[in-house]
Amino acid sequence: MADKFEFTAKEREETIALIDHLRSTIGATLQPKDEEKLRVRLANSLTYNQVHRDVFGLNPILSGLQTAKIVVEEIGLKRDAVLAILLHPSVEDGFMTIEEVRSEFGESPARILHGLLRISELYKKNPVVESENFRNLLLSFAEDMRVILIMIADRVRLMRQIKDNTNDEARHEVSQEAAYLYAPLAHKLGLYKLKSELEDLSLK
């Protein structure tokens, strides 16, 4: 059995700060029971040991909150994107269905999550992603442009976090994708600041 997932003291502090920040930033767009339902879902995922660190040792709940902060502050998305980001690990790992998301949070977050799952399937079928053909496939599979915006934000978040990580092989792979896939997508969508940051971080 896998070790029980635990937050470090620093992660707990940052998580609380990010939740407070997101609440103050997008609170007006949240529906009455959004936060309560999300808290229950995340608490259950911890209780049933459904949360695991990624290949870089990063905390997925904290990573989701960091990505959510980027999509809110640097791209301008709000409630539906944030909910989709925070629920994505549970849905991707099979602990929650798209139908449950639709029932609890509405059609819009469910639509974004459906697009994110389609992209995951596309990745599994295409080991080589550094091509214009794959970028075009990505755009068509996403269905909703918010999916691509979230993916760009998540890659920016990951690149910021792993610049000093010792897993050189995984870091190199992520950097290659940032330079050849996500930076061109960011440019195409007019996210020039994020595009430049992706290019800069991919060289480090």
What residue ranges belong to the model's regions?
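Active-site helical microenvironments for divalent-metal-assisted chemistry
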Residues: 1-204
